[in-house]
A protein has these predicted regions:
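Interaction-mediating elements
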Residues: 1-129
Length: 129
């Protein structure tokens, strides 16, 4: 399971939202071996004055916060980050200094879905990749 939040200025996020979602999804499927039908992305459109970013970035600055079960290898997480930089830059007109990625991992028992705690749900994919 992974939940992905995307933050950016409304005027620069809205026009590329679908391309960003597609790029994110392709990265998660490849790096974490997610099933193609597992997509959970939320876009947070910020207004100027509510979103401050580093001086080294432009108004295109975009933050990706990924929350997922613990258990993925360091290599898989690094591959996900590298793929996100490559594909978001390519498909959504961002530069590397305009992208920030954070991954937060929590135990399965801290999740709840399909009516049960996450550690009691049988998944159709592997977490230990």
């Amino acid at each position: 399971m992974a939940q992905i939040k995307v933050y950016g200025l409304r005027e620069h996020l809205e026009p590329v939202k679908q391309r960003l979602s597609d790029a994110i999804h392709s990265c998660v499927v490849e790096a974490l071996r997610f099933p193609a039908d597992k997509r959970a992305h939320r876009f947070f459109h910020m207004e100027e004055g509510d979103f401050y970013f580093p001086a080294s970035a432009s108004e295109m600055y975009t933050i990706f916060e990924i929350s997922m079960f613990e258990g993925r290898s360091i290599d898989a997480k690094k591959q996900l980050i590298r793929l996100l930089f490559d594909r978001v830059c390519d498909q959504a007109d961002r530069k590397p200094n305009e992208i920030e990625v954070t991954i937060t991992e929590t135990p399965k028992h801290n999740w709840g879905f399909r009516g049960s705690p996450g550690d009691e749900v049988s998944l159709a994919y592997k977490v230990d990749v």
